[in-house]
Amino acid sequence: MLRKNKNILTFFLIFYIATYTSVAQKNYILPEPQNITFPETEKPGFRLSKKTSLNVTGSSLTNPQITDLIKFIKNETGFEVSTSKQNKKSNIELVVDENIHNLGDEGYKISIIPNENLKVHATTENGLFYGIQSLKQIIHFTKRKRDEENFNDFDVEIETKKIESNSSNVNDFNAANITTKGYKNINETAHFYGKEEVQKKTLDIYNITSMIIEDYPRFSYRGMMLDVSRHFMPVDFIKKFIDIIALHKMNKFHWHLTDDQGWRIEIKKYPLLTEIGSYRSETLKGHYRFAGNNPKYDGIPHQGFYTQDEIKEIVLYASKRYIEIIPEVDMPGHTSALIASYPEFGTNSEKVEVKRIWGIQDEILKPTEKTFSFIEDLIVELKDIFPSEYFHIGGDEAKKTQWENSSEIQELMINLEIEDVDSLQSYFTGRVEKILSKYGKKLIGWDEIIEGGLNENAIVMSWRGEEGGITAVKAGNKAIMTPTSHMYFDYYQAKAGEPIAIGGLIDLEKVYSYEPVPSGIDLNEASRIMGAQGNIWTEYIKTPEKVEYMGVPRMTALSEVVWSKRKNRDFNEFKTRLKFYRYFLDINKINYREKSFQ
């Protein structure tokens, strides 16, 4: 039975129009481009049609980003876009030209001008990669804009199942099958909200708004850290996490591979690191702060590590998405799993276990020649597997009580003329830095490496607020800003109704409000702020799905913090663009936090 139902139609129209707002003459790209202008013209900048082809210059037609763009256009429009080397009209030009100036290695330019080809130009393949990402957003939102405009002539007929004309029951509405008359210029069947089916007709052209974009990142370091020691994450998810980083035009993956609760990387010269160190017998139940003197455990063994072949595969996967993987092997503290495997490298001789509980542990490496030889062996095995110029040594939360109580260490300090244990950690860091330098690597450490004296070439990752980063840049060192106040994505996202987390509260607006360049430093010092990083520690994150939930869309907010001009940032405007950007999270099957979009 077919009949008009004005109440239901009104509800549907209001809901649809509220969701699909106009995007004409407005930026909807995320992160916000550095410069975007809209030429004054009534003509569309480019007509995307089934006759459109891709003209590729300076890059391979087999470039996976280009083949992915072709697939994306087909999914969005139904058009089978071909590739061509001919410079004809109705082309999308993808050009890599090292002679293009002012864009840098990661920048790109998009020109959409009437009567001209749509052009995406970049100095490098990396820049082209980011330009293609922005082009995808332009194409998708062109489709959204057109769908909205054609909704004006929507004539809906509803086949109901016993729906009263005055019904306000949402379940009644969802039971209705919606069909259309006069819904022109649409080329596919859409499923609104998963239940209402709308039949669409065919359209041959998508008119893309005229615009010129010149874009490049504000910071060279745009990173995310994932802890896989507390809870191991499978290879397939590590690749997906890399995809999520790339989706946000971020370029650094800090991989926290070792800690007290697990050693996650194969070292062939030291097989016990994975035979013993990758396994813990069980894990703390509930929150650490409530464990008290009688903690409860789940009785479930937890184990996992990455082979060197798997890591090579992951590093290659990341490189194709222009992401640099920075490994972290934590030392001299957070080394219980290491010392459980090889007790001779620990300060005390007593046997220890791979920790089942969170928090700061007593175990600390013995700063002797034997230990430094071991560390060099690690670096020799890892230096080529991880081609990054950076190597993170942790250095945080090293509890030095064992050093203070060891007669051997006290004698060592006298011989080295070291006055206190903080200075001994500085000595330890300096020795490791020399090993890394020998193999062409630069040392990164958490801000505790400042205590006892900062080594000349060390890069400080400032997590206990901003003071560590400020101290570093004033001393002539570089810094990466990642304070717990804004950048810890394992913190709660709301005051109530959230899954268990380590503590704190960092909502979407808090992340977006962060400014990586702190006040109180001059321009020269500010130039040594490399960028910022979000961190996902996994004490209370057992699954890939929860990693995604905790990370997104806070990672989306961070992407704009590290990419866009400070003066361009506006949270309300960001929230509007975020609603459109949600589509890209959906098609990548990301388990984001839906409440952040409300």
Label the model's feature ranges.
Residues 442-458, 464-598:
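Flexible, acidic glycine-rich loops studded with aromatic residues
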Residues 62-63, 232-234, 260-266, 332-338, ...:
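Flexible loop/turn segments at secondary-structure boundaries
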Residues 1-9:
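Bacterial N-terminal signal peptides that target proteins for export
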Residues 113-362, 368-372, 376-390, 431, ...:
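Feature activates predominantly on carbohydrate-active enzymes
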Residues 14, 22-191, 195, 199, ...:
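Acidic, contiguous N-terminal accessory segments
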Residues 338-344, 354-356, 360-456, 463-471:
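Active-site neighborhood of glycoside hydrolase catalytic domains
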Residues 8-18:
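Sec-dependent N-terminal signal peptides
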